A protein has these predicted regions:
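Conserved glycine-rich cofactor-binding loop
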Residues: 12-13
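The beta1-alpha1 cofactor-binding region of Rossmann-like NAD(H)/NADP(H)-dependent oxidoreductases
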Residues: 37, 55-65, 97, 225
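Active-site helix of classical SDR
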Residues: 115, 154, 162
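Residue(s) in the substrate-gating loop at a strand-loop-helix junction
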Residues: 137
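Short C-terminal tail/terminal secondary-structure segment
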Residues: 142, 219, 231, 236, ...
Length: 255
């Protein structure tokens, strides 16, 4: 495989799809993974060099299987993007153990073991200048997000995990960073608009106006806004960046 190889989890739609497309534009061969196998195949079919693999990130064995297939088929792995994530809005006092466990299983455990599988493969393949990118959230930088306490906890965890990984994996020539999106126009956001509207007793359109008002640059974020930053983190220009959490949110939250 002459092209660089990237794995993107949760790439069947939304931010993950945009990341897969951006990396393809940057001449990567992309492994498009998703729990929805058909969605992964549909995305892979739009890219010049890609293949699709079904992957449930809540099952560490699935992530290991993806990494092993890359070692066997492509025989190189340059970039791993742990993007798969979920959210469901509820008041803190209404979040039960089942809801909490599901959110943490996907958003934190899923990132932990997916990125671990990628790192192991990179080390075994002796990859030089390897990159791992964990998709976090603006909610990882500001806990004052309503109706998402379990989600906030999971994304704060991703930031801590990213720093720990960056420190431990630096001797293996692996850089690890996270990206923190804000209010992104995705299928997930459509559901979030409806949930927040119901919880607040207002219309989804009013919630959308609130989100835009809270974003100084005056619009909702696009998946491509996130993907471009991920692309930068895979480039030579970012070779001395590791352990960082880069906010991409139009100013909705500022460090």
């Amino acid at each position: 495989m002459d092209k660089k190889v990237a794995v993107v989890t949760g790439a069947g739609s939304g931010i993950g799809r945009a990341i897969a497309t951006e990396l393809s534009y940057r001449d990567f061969h992309v492994i498009v993974t998703d729990l929805n196998e058909q969605a992964a195949k549909d995305v892979a079919a739009t890219l010049p060099s890609a293949r699709a693999v079904k992957c449930d990130v809540t099952l560490p064995t699935d992530s290991v299987a993806v990494a092993n297939s890359v070692k066997e088929i492509e025989k190189r792995l340059d970039v791993w993007v742990s993007n798969a994530g979920v959210s469901k809005m509820a008041k803190f006092l209404d979040i039960d153990e089942k809801m909490y466990d599901f959110t943490l299983d996907v958003n934190l455990k899923g990132v932990f073991f997916a990125s671990q599988a990628g790192a192991r493969a990179m080390i075994e393949l002796k990859t030089k200048d390897a990159r791992i990118i964990n998709i976090a959230s603006m909610a990882a930088k500001a806990g004052r997000v309503p109706f998402l306490a379990d989600y906030v906890a999971s994304k704060f965890g991703v930031l801590g995990l990213t720093q720990a990984m960056a420190y431990e994996l630096a001797p293996n020539d692996i850089r690890v960073n996270s990206v923190c999106p804000g209010f992104v126009s995705t299928p997930m956001q459509v559901r979030e608009l409806a949930w927040e509207a119901d919880l607040r007793g207002i219309s989804p359109e009013d919630v959308k106006k609130m989100w835009i008002k809270d974003t100084p640059l005056g619009r909702l974020e696009l998946p491509e806004d996130v993907a471009k930053v991920v692309g930068f983190l895979t480039s030579k220009d970012s070779e001395f960046i590791t352990g960082e959490a880069i906010a991409v949110n139009g100013g909705a939250f500022m460090d």
